[in-house]
């Protein structure tokens, strides 16, 4: 590690000279590179490095942006294989940079760049916490300069305005109720035999051979789409192209049913609110509604233990943005968690039912909770995280860079292909041209993506359709100002989801629920959004029978890096040589999910993708259930046979370049529930009980196992 002794002018001069030589080499290579950066701020990256050179020459250790704010430069991402380099501005709260930060960037520059003739150098913005602190100070001054009575009165007016908002919203939704019976039943999936026959004819399989065929690869529960069908990364060869004809075979609606749903949908679009009610801004003087950025969780009851773990790691990663935990019901409100623990982590609870009319509280169903949480949360721009979602890196930087700054809604993919029924597009009035292919969701080399006959076009590769893949909304970035109507239309979808829209969006596929409502609403309203392209990656032990990875957790990737790699060929039109970040293609593909001769688990869509979130959803970190009862399904850190194992195999550690994130999770679990001061939460064994002691011993044992495995 380099440092510059203040007392030694000679040594300082030598080191500065060496750094200048390195910078000159970097700039020369940068100019030789045929690629200029796509980040708006990095158009001036040469000037920024010149600024750094001048700063160091004049014994200055900081840089200033156009507004005079102090920042340093730190490494954000460096992939040695593709030689993609991303440097981040780090805004400083003090006038001098942290010594570790300075040395970090020094070492970043002193890497092997000078030996590279070409590399792709990019600059991104960091999060300027000074603006956040300024806002907090202004808010505190505002509260100190007004009486309690005035603040209390205005907050009550704000809450009443929110309740009125929901009254109007629910009245509008109920006024547009579809005039037909529910469609989410077996009667609307009558084509099981027809689908099997279709598969037999398409693949020219003799009827005798079909007797050995696993029907569950085509249908489940009479005639629904396979739960785990259409694995996007594995591209199983036996799977049929999901063209319009094939997708239309599952959920079956009559003309009158389609007409009734279309009438309801059209009426809601014509009567839905266009903007937030003015009263919410009239009475938000003393609160943070629609002000700034923040991170939102949906917690309450047993979920609080999951939220606490996630927030603890969030803060450990360096995030400073405020956190809100939305608690659905009063019975779920944990005083210990909300009033004592969360404030120490710059977080607070918000009780959902305070903002809802009582008549609506009794009607809330589980799949509507996320939508409501997004609406009532304080912030204008939100990173929403499920309680069981754990950030691997500091997510604050996502707020200050594309794609979020340009698209205002970022969604991540599920493991599976999209299974949305063509009927949805008819009902929503979205024109899809099945004869016009605008993208190819099959990787190069897959014959299913090469057809020129439109009858073989994947429906969700066609003009007007929502692109692949299906959505996984354990994490979601949304600007509530720009996407207000997205949330309102999604609320309509979720209100009538279980009876109508969930089967239209998923047709029985894995995770059927609210997950498709946000992207569908934005798509219908023609509002901007970005889908992360890198495959969702399952982590877990390898199944002894299928040799495939179990789904213990899902890994999601950095949207900043993803956006760059996915858009580079369209944004760099003037370069002589375009850098292609697509990964080399697999040599072969498995026939189906039971084929143990081949797996493309290590295949990434892009060469330089960076893992960002771990959605630890099965098993969740309910510590008693996980460590003492193996999650009831032999999914714990110790198998039913007594063998210790990593929950996410060695693949998670490999994906993170050797960083043992599972070990870090376990150490934080121990900190949360086994170290002083011991915390009692709903769903956690009582402090001092034998069960609590046994859980902590099991966590400690797993930590020791991970440290040597």
Curated annotation (Swiss-Prot):
Glycosylation sites: 317
TM segment ranges: 10-30
Listed GO MF terms: alpha-1,2-mannosyltransferase activity
This protein's encoding gene: MNN24
Extracellular compartment spans: 31-709
Keywords on record: Glycoprotein, Golgi apparatus, Membrane, Signal-anchor, Transferase, Transmembrane, Transmembrane helix
Membrane-topology descriptor: Single-pass type II membrane protein
Ranges facing Cytoplasmic side: 1-9
Name of the protein: Alpha-1,2-mannosyltransferase MNN24
SUPFAM superfamilies given in the database record: Nucleotide-diphospho-sugar transferases
Organism name: Candida albicans (strain SC5314 / ATCC MYA-2876) (Yeast)
Highest taxon of the lineage: Eukaryota
Subcellular localization, as worded in the UniProt entry: Golgi apparatus membrane
GO CC annotations on file: Golgi apparatus; Golgi membrane
Pathway: Protein modification; protein glycosylation
Top class in the EC scheme: transferase
Taxonomic path: Eukaryota, Fungi, Dikarya, Ascomycota, Saccharomycotina
């Amino acid at each position: 590690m380099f440092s510059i002794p203040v007392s030694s002018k000679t040594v300082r001069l030598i080191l500065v000279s060496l750094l200048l030589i390195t910078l000159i080499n970097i700039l020369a290579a940068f100019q030789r590179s045929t690629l200029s950066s796509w980040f708006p701020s990095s158009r001036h990256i040469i000037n920024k490095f010149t600024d750094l050179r001048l700063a160091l020459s004049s014994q200055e250790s900081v840089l200033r942006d156009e507004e005079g704010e102090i920042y340093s430069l730190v490494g954000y991402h460096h992939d040695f294989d593709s030689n993609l380099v991303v440097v981040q501005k780090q805004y400083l709260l003090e006038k001098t940079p942290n010594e570790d930060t300075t040395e970090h960037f020094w070492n970043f520059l002193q890497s092997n760049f000078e030996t590279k003739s070409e590399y792709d150098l990019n600059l991104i913005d960091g999060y300027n916490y000074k603006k956040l602190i300024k806002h907090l100070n202004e808010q505190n001054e505002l509260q100190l300069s007004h009486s309690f009575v005035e603040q209390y009165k205005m907050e009550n007016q704000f809450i009443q305005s929110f309740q009125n908002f929901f009254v109007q919203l629910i009245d509008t939704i109920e006024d547009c109720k579809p005039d037909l019976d529910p469609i989410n039943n077996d009667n609307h999936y009558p084509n099981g035999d027809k689908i099997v026959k279709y598969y037999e004819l398409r693949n020219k399989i003799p009827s005798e051979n079909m007797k050995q065929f696993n029907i569950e690869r085509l249908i489940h529960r009479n005639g629904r789409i396979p739960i785990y069908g259409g694995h996007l990364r594995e591209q199983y060869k036996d799977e049929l192209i999901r063209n319009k004809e094939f997708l239309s075979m599952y959920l079956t609606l009559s003309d009158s049913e389609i007409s009734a749903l279309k009438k309801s949908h059209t009426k809601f679009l014509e009567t839905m609110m266009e903007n937030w009610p003015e009263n919410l801004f009239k009475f938000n003087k003393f609160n943070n509604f629609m002000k700034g950025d923040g991170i939102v969780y949906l917690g309450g009851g047993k979920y609080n233990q999951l939220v606490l773990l996630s927030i603890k790691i969030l803060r450990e990663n360096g995030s400073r943005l405020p956190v809100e935990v939305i608690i659905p019901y009063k019975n779920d409100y944990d005083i210990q968690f909300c009033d004592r623990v969360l404030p120490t982590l710059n977080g607070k609870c918000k009780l959902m039912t305070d903002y809802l009319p009582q008549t609506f509280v009794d009607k809330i169903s589980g799949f509507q909770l996320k939508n409501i949480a997004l609406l009532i949360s304080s912030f204008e721009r939100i990173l929403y995280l499920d309680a069981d979602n754990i950030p691997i890196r500091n997510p604050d930087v996502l707020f200050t860079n594309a794609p979020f700054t340009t698209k205002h809604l970022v969604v991540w993919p599920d493991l599976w292909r999209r299974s949305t029924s063509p009927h949805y597009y008819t009902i929503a009035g979205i024109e899809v041209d099945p004869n016009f292919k605008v993208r190819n969701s099959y990787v190069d080399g897959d014959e299913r993506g090469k057809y020129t006959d439109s009858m073989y076009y994947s429906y969700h590769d066609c003009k007007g359709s929502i692109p692949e893949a299906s959505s996984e909304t354990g994490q979601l970035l949304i600007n509530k100002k720009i996407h207000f109507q997205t949330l309102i239309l999604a609320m309509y979808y979720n209100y009538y989801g279980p009876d109508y829209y969930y089967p239209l969006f998923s047709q029985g596929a894995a995770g059927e629920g609210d997950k498709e409502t946000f992207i569908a609403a934005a798509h219908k309203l023609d509002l901007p959004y970005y889908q992360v392209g890198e495959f969702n990656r399952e982590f877990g032990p390898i199944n002894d029978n299928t040799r495939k990875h179990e789904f213990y957790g899902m890994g999601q990737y950095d949207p900043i890096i993803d956006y760059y790699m996915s858009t580079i060929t369209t944004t760099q039109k003037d370069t002589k040589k375009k850098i292609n970040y697509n990964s080399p293609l697999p040599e072969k593909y498995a026939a189906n999910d039971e084929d143990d001769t081949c797996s493309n688990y290590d295949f990434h869509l892009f060469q330089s993708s960076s893992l960002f979130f771990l959605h630890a959803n099965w098993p969740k970190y309910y510590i008693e259930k996980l460590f003492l009862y193996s999650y009831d399904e032999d999914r714990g850190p110790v198998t039913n046979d007594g063998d210790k194992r990593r929950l996410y195999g060695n693949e998670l550690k490999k994906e993170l370049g050797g960083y043992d994130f599972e070990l870090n999770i376990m150490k934080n679990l121990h900190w949360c529930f086994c170290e002083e001061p011991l915390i009692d939460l709903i769903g956690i064994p009582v402090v001092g009980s034998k069960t609590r002691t046994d859980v902590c011993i099991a966590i400690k044992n797993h930590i020791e196992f991970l440290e040597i495995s």
